[in-house]
Amino acid sequence: MAKIYYDEDASLGILAMKTVAIVGYGSQGHAHALNLRDSGIRVIVALDDKSPHRKTAMEDGFSVYTTSRATQEADVIMILTPDTVQPAVYKECIEPNLTPGKAIAFAHGFNIHFGQIVPPKDIDVFMVAPKGPGHLVRWMYEEGKGVPALISIHQDATGSCRDIALAYAKGIGATRAGVIETTFREETETDLFGEQAVLCGGATALIKAGFETLVEAGYQPEMAYFECLHELKLIVDLIYQHGIAGMRYSISDTAKYGDVTRGDRVYEAVKPLMKQMLKEIQDGEFAREWILENQANRPVYNALLNKDKEHLVEKVGKELRQMMPWLSGKELK
């Protein structure tokens, strides 16, 4: 079983005389910065001069510097920019300003695990990854609670990296809930697999396959949308709150019987494909493909996204959502 750390396992004292730089001020960045500051830690924010978040960070009372300057000033640098821009930001602004004994930190292991960022041997490298969006991290902190997080030590140059990482996790409120020890490899590979096989790729493919099956059989697209997409939230919310068994407790016996007698057909069909997807993540094939795709300005990425935007389920959904006053009515673009 995993090693889990709580409040009593961490001390903020090790950060008392240090400065933490938060690189980025988006969903996670603003939550980390505010929570750390409220925990008594000196925090500065690193943003490009043209960043739309610069004004917000300043209004929140932070000193805002360029990433180069912030790296010079800080002892701990948490990099919370998107994965795809991190290597360039690191190479241009962070690496030249690192000195022995500093620490860099991440909330996702992609660039370290796949070698897109290779830190010098004389600095600490760790990860603190909350398992929830930034607004939840902030809200739970303000409520005196916390969001569980992952922690990993990639490189301990000072001998104090784990203590620094745990202090950081405590500063954002994560140790109130529990911090699970992992590795950069495990976090990266499981995160990518979950996104591809279940949460994003798997879920959207299942929705489209179900929708198309009903429409091709002559059923109205509106009915197919309700049964294969709209009602998914009801089930996912139950699973999220109570687990699979708890969800089954809340649905009809007919739905339950169909679940346990027919669901295995999908299971048996997709599990071998999931294993292949995991292999492509483990051997670096997906990472190489994604890195090259970005270097080529994302032609396949953009083409596939645009193709899916034209799917009938999108047209039908847009019309049906206008009938639902409890939704915002504002379409995301």
UniProtKB/Swiss-Prot annotation:
Per its UniProt record, what Gene3D superfamilies does this chain match? Answer: 6.10.240.10, NAD(P)-binding Rossmann-like Domain
Q: Which residues form the active site?
A: 108
For this chain's record, the cofactor binding note is: Binds 2 magnesium ions per subunit.
Pathway per the UniProt entry: Amino-acid biosynthesis; L-isoleucine biosynthesis; L-isoleucine from 2-oxobutanoate: step 2/4; Amino-acid biosynthesis; L-valine biosynthesis; L-valine from pyruvate: step 2/4
Q: Where is the KARI N-terminal Rossmann domain?
A: 2-182
Q: What is its EC number?
A: 1.1.1.383
Q: Which reaction does it catalyse?
A: (2R)-2,3-dihydroxy-3-methylbutanoate + NAD(+) = (2S)-2-acetolactate + NADH + H(+); (2R)-2,3-dihydroxy-3-methylbutanoate + NADP(+) = (2S)-2-acetolactate + NADPH + H(+)
Where along this sequence does the record place binding of NADP(+)? 25-28, 51, 83-86, 134
Q: Cite the InterPro entries for this sequence.
A: 6-PGluconate_DH-like_C_sf, KARI, KARI_C, KARI_N, KARI_prok, NAD(P)-bd_dom_sf
Name the needed cofactors: Mg(2+)
Is Acyltransferase among the key words of this record? no
> SUPFAM superfamilies annotated for this entry?
6-phosphogluconate dehydrogenase C-terminal domain-like (SSF48179), NAD(P)-binding Rossmann-fold domains (SSF51735)
Instruction: Write down any Gene Ontology CC term.
Output: cytosol
Family note? Belongs to the ketol-acid reductoisomerase family.
HAMAP family under this entry? Answer: IlvC
What name does UniProt use for this protein?
A: Ketol-acid reductoisomerase (NAD(P)(+))
The organism's taxonomy opens as:
Bacteria, Pseudomonadati, Aquificota, Aquificia, Aquificales
